[in-house]
Curated annotation (Swiss-Prot):
It comes from the Eukaryota. The lineage of its organism: Eukaryota, Metazoa, Chordata, Craniata, Vertebrata. 3'-phosphoadenylyl sulfate binds at residues 47-52, 129, 137, 192, 226-231, 256-258. This is Sulfotransferase 1E1. It is found in: Cytoplasm, Cytosol. GO terms for cellular component: cytoplasm; cytosol; nuclear membrane. It comes from Homo sapiens. It catalyses: estrone + 3'-phosphoadenylyl sulfate = estrone 3-sulfate + adenosine 3',5'-bisphosphate + H(+); (24S)-hydroxycholesterol + 3'-phosphoadenylyl sulfate = (24S)-hydroxycholesterol 3-sulfate + adenosine 3',5'-bisphosphate + H(+); 17beta-estradiol + 3'-phosphoadenylyl sulfate = 17beta-estradiol 3-sulfate + adenosine 3',5'-bisphosphate + H(+); 3beta-hydroxyandrost-5-en-17-one + 3'-phosphoadenylyl sulfate = dehydroepiandrosterone 3-sulfate + adenosine 3',5'-bisphosphate + H(+). The active site is at 107 (proton acceptor).
């Protein structure tokens, strides 16, 4: 029972969604955030390829200039809106002090996104990934990032994931809510699996959405610079600049595998059957379809 208490000790609900306690403490600042019309929001459920799509977008903004992308770490170039860790991290403050055009990272579901983003009609990119691979990646994230309780065994963690008892709540609700928002021409809805399968096609889609002109040279440069191996070895994207007491990559690297289908190495037959049954219940009303392998 104690381990259950320890687990929830780190989190607090905000509008019915489980969230990191440190973030909730300053929630008023997040809700009151003032968007600008030329802000671009990159929204994802955690562990869905946020850093990957962020670096692609940043490269489009910088017209493929790799050196400009390496001038600072990604969490300074694209601040994490709701992130707050006392004096260490403050997404709202970072963004307030930033010149336009700003790129804003968030894991918030649409109903928690500050109202000013909708009022200013900001463009939003939403990237999602199949639930099984997200659950695996989230499990390893719990193990290596400070501020997370012990996730228990993998099957125990999957149970919590299925019930939405993880930061940012239910994956099912998150993706379904954003899928509805994706019907707006101001929201581009992308799948991680599509990026893995045909990166060129998805990069061109992003360039068009951002109203830039695609050239073969630009697309080639983006594809090379944002490949998994390049980003894993790049200190401005691999989070190795963070001290071990915040993110201990000796336990699990931040850039772990970057593949589709790793869930097969973690789900037993019984766990997979249980997950599939629950998944079907949660997603039966939705037209949203995912691929768990490519």
């Amino acid at each position: 029972m104690n381990s259950e208490l320890d687990y929830y000790e780190k989190f607090e609900e905000v509008h019915g969604i489980l969230m990191y306690k440190d973030f909730v403490k300053y929630w008023d600042n997040v809700e009151a955030f003032q968007a600008r019309p030329d802000d671009l929001v990159i929204a994802t459920y955690p562990k869905s390829g946020t850093t990957w799509v962020s670096e692609i977008v940043y490269m489009i903004y910088k017209e493929g200039d790799v050196e400009k992308c390496k001038e600072d770490v990604i969490f300074n170039r694209i601040p994490f809106l709701e992130c707050r860790k006392e004096n260490l991290m403050n997404g709202v403050k970072q963004l307030d002090e930033m010149n336009s055009p700003r790129i804003v990272k968030t894991h918030l579901p649409p109903e928690l996104l500050p109202a000013s983003f909708w009022e200013k009609d900001c463009k939003i990119i939403y990237l999602c990934r199949n639930a099984k691979d997200v659950a695996v990646s989230f499990y390893y994230f719990f193990l290596m990032v400070a501020g997370h309780p012990n996730p228990g065994s993998f099957p125990e963690f999957v149970e919590k994931f299925m019930q939405g008892q993880v930061p940012y709540g239910s994956w099912y609700k998150h993706v379904k809510s954003w899928w509805e928002k994706g019907k707006s021409p101001r929201v581009l809805f992308l799948f991680y699996e599509d990026l893995k399968e045909d990166i060129r096609k998805e990069v061109i889609k992003l360039i068009h959405f951002l109203e830039r002109k695609p050239s073969e040279e630009l697309v080639d440069r983006i594809i090379h610079h944002t490949s998994f191996q390049e980003m894993k070895n790049n200190p401005s994207t691999n989070y190795t600049t963070l001290p071990d007491e915040i993110m201990n990559q000796k336990l699990s690297p931040f850039m772990r595998k970057g593949i589709t289908g790793d869930w097969k190495n973690h789900f037993t037959v019984a766990l997979n059957e249980k997950f599939d049954k629950h998944y079907e219940q949660q997603m039966k009303e939705s037209t949203l379809k995912f691929r768990t392998e490519i």
